Each structure stands twice: as C-alpha cells, then as structure tokens.
C-alpha cells in the first residue's frame, strides 16, 4: 500500500516537477495478477487497479493492519469500472459478470471479493475507488445503458464530451462515493474547461484510452497558482479540494472521475472563469 499524505496548497505551489508527481500522480495502476493500492489521507480515499491474468486476485487480510480492520470492506464501500476485457467479480459467493465499461458497486461489509478474467488473452482491467462508509447499501451491477449521460462542450472550443454518471444518486445509493466516465468526442482535447474546484469534495482522475505517443497535460493547483502534471495512458492523479482539475491532451482520450467528501451533489462546484486563471 502506497500512502500519500494530504498537503497544504501553500506547500504544493513550491514543488518542482518531480515533487508534484510524487505527491499527486499514481503512475502504475495495473500490474498483471496483482492489485495496486494508493491510500490518500485526503478524505481517506483508496485508488487502484486489479488485472487478473493467469489467476484470480483478491484483497486479503494483509491490508487489515494498515486500515485498522479485520477485512478490506469492513468499514468501506467499493466502486469498480472495468476498462479491459470481460471479467467476473465474486462478492461473498455471488458472481457478477462485468464486461467492458460495466461497473460494480460493492457495499460495506462484503468479506470476500474475488476478481477474475474470462479470457486471459484479453484480461479484465478493474479500476477502483474505495471510500469510508457508514452504512451498507446493496451490491449492484451498473451497465452503460443504465448510466446518466450528459453531453457538454462544443467542437469550436475543443471540449465536446459525454459524461456518463455510473455511481450517482440517480442511479444507485452509496454512502459518499461518486464515480463516472467521461469520453471526449473525436478531435476534442480539453476536459473540464472552464474549470472548477469543489470545497466539499476531493476528486481523482484516471486517464486511459490513450495512444502510446499521446499524453495529457493535467492542470492542477489553486486557480491563481496553476501547475501541470504530464499524464500517460492508464495513470491516475489525486486532486485536493483546493485544486482545479482539468486537462488537455495531444489526442482525444477518456477518463474516469471519482469523488468523495461532504455531499453527492454533482453541480456543487466553485466555477472559475478562464480569464481568472493564472
């Protein structure tokens, strides 16, 4: 488990390129036949990937000491979106087949969660966010047909994109975790511009569906103290409440966003005008 401490905005603005990457970038999300796990002190979110290839993968009691519990989801809820080939997630004996861009919400208290790929030639890639939970909501599969899609932006401003809301109150109940998938239209490069912050929530972006020769310049920092982190395919970045989170790519891309914090009101944002950015 990679533990990331929270950081004050006054400290963050003094960091150089490597310092920013050390604090906020999750460089390696998927490792064959393993799970990765980054624990952030910011709202206690856990972020990672699970890629079963030749065997099943589960998060066992080895994380209990670090989380102060007997098993992983004793006091947590889990959201998983599969960006790879078809796979299965077995929750306390109940097997769910999770295809490409399908998702599974797992409620607090699930003791055994096992991940597997159906075809080792095209393994599943389960990207997950995990957050503290105060009650148990039912485990539920979510398909692309069930999400709440919203198309925003314009080709003229190069930010035409479709936001697919997987884990939001309109789709299912969670304690605090919200997740979704945003896909840029061909030829569009900007996400979340004009940008915003949200004082009451933190957020993690996971960029994928990128060519090897492409990258995203992820913008972060306070609106008057902006910085950037160069992102490559299948990497994630942590965004504190005080930071903007926006990006521009050298080619179109897709990203998964996950939020935890005070509320689940999607539009609870503090908008920042482009003219006010520095």
Curated annotation (Swiss-Prot):
InterPro entries: KduI (IPR007045), KduI/IolB_isomerase (IPR021120), KduI_N (IPR027449), RmlC-like_jellyroll (IPR014710), RmlC_Cupin_sf (IPR011051). Its EC number is 5.3.1.17. GO terms for molecular function: 4-deoxy-L-threo-5-hexosulose-uronate ketol-isomerase activity; zinc ion binding. Its cofactor is Zn(2+). It catalyses: 5-dehydro-4-deoxy-D-glucuronate = 3-deoxy-D-glycero-2,5-hexodiulosonate. Zn(2+) binds at residues 196, 198, 203, 245. Pathway: Glycan metabolism; pectin degradation; 2-dehydro-3-deoxy-D-gluconate from pectin: step 4/5. GO terms for biological process: D-galacturonate catabolic process; D-glucuronate catabolic process; pectin catabolic process. Keywords: Isomerase, Metal-binding, Zinc. It holds the Pfam family KduI. The keyword Isomerase applies. It is an enzyme of class 5 (isomerase). Homohexamer. NCBIfam families: PRK00924.1. Catalyzes the isomerization of 5-dehydro-4-deoxy-D-glucuronate to 3-deoxy-D-glycero-2,5-hexodiulosonate. Belongs to the KduI family. This is 4-deoxy-L-threo-5-hexosulose-uronate ketol-isomerase. It comes from Escherichia coli (strain SMS-3-5 / SECEC).
């Amino acid at each position: 488990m990679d533990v990331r401490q929270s950081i004050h905005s006054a400290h963050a603005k003094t960091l150089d390129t490597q310092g920013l990457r050390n604090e906020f970038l999750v460089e390696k999300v998927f490792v064959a036949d393993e799970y990765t796990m980054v624990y952030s002190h910011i709202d206690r979110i856990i972020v990672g990937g699970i890629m079963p290839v030749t065997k099943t993968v589960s998060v066992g009691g080895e994380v209990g000491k670090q989380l102060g519990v007997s098993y992983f989801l004793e006091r947590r809820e889990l959201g998983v979106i599969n960006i790879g080939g078809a796979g299965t997630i077995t929750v306390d004996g109940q097997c769910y087949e999770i295809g490409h861009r399908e998702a599974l919400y797992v409620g607090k208290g699930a003791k055994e969660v096992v991940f597997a790929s159906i075809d080792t030639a095209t393994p599943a890639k389960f990207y997950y966010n995990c957050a503290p939970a105060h009650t148990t909501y039912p485990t539920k599969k979510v398909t692309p047909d069930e999400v709440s899609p919203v198309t925003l932006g314009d080709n003229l401003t190069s930010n035409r994109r479709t936001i697919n809301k997987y884990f939001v109150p309109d789709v299912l109940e969670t304690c605090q975790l919200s997740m979704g998938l945003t896909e840029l239209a061909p030829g569009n490069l900007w996400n979340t511009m004009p940008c915003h912050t949200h004082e009451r929530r933190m957020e993690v972006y996971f960029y994928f569906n990128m060519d090897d020769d492409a990258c995203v310049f992820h913008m972060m920092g306070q609106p008057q103290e902006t910085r950037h982190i160069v992102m490559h395919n299948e990497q994630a970045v942590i965004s504190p409440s005080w930071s903007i989170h926006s990006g521009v790519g050298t080619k179109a891309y897709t990203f998964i966003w996950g939020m935890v914090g005070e509320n689940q009101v999607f539009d609870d944002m503090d908008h920042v005008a482009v003219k006010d950015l520095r």
